[in-house]
Amino acid sequence: MSEMKWAIITGADGGMGTEITRAVAKAGYRIIMACYHPQKAEVVRERLSKETGNPDLEVMAIDLSSMQSVVAFASQILERNLPISLLMNNAGTMETGFHTTSEGFERTVSVNYMGPYLLTRKLIPLMVRGARIVNMVSCTYAIGKLDFPDFFHRGKTGTFWRIPVYSNTKLALLLFTFELSEQLREKGISVNAADPGIVSTDIITMHKWFDPLTDIFFRPFIRKPKKGASTAISLLLDEKEAGVTGQLYVNNHRKNLSDKYTNHVQKEQLWEITERALASWLK
């Protein structure tokens, strides 16, 4: 397999992560499975390697809620000087309560936004021309709001509400996608976002975030991980998506967003504040 075909996939052992890893493995990439639970991921790695006939799958530990862990992970990749063709920021969480990380950030914000932001920024020097970055967002970006500085430390002023906080992180990740795509356009690196729809993943099945009435409303629309992952897989691998950048895709199609999002009034401000918040780890 080509030395130039390296892919990094966060949350590669989860529902959608497994589907994405399977597709990328079948396409012949050497894969770093960046996972929070290495032992669990090792079982998935072994199974996928046998299924796809691709022996070049490797598990590496990462805790996206810890910026120090993200830096340590990125440092290992940088030391190996791996030419990265694909970066899939797939991992995510929806905390059921308010949790502050050891670095002082709200945990949902760290895992869903700050960790992926930092990881991506650290790995850009290794990305080859034509590389693709895909960020997994959510339809909930539409109800997200960015209140600074509470966004980083509390997520929402006052009582912690998990769905609004989760939505805020997905809006932030979408705006990061748009801003980064502009900065990397001349380097020939594409940056896009994938909305998987409402998918049956650990966020739903383990955290039980919806009440019975919400369950009744959403259950008919909940997708299997394979279907939810299809849009991200298309953005990563389809030749017709080569060169496409700064877009949000839903159901394997480009979504036409209004200026409210593509030129969001807080897009540049979010970038600047995030850079300051992560300054000590971006060095």
Regions of interest found by a model, annotated:
Residues 17-18:
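N-terminal Rossmann-fold NAD(P) dinucleotide-binding loop
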Residues 72-79, 96, 102-110:
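Active-site Tyr-X3-Lys motif and surrounding loop/helix of classical short-chain dehydrogenase/reductase
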Residues 92-100, 106, 132-187, 195-210, ...:
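Catalytic loop of short-chain dehydrogenase/reductase
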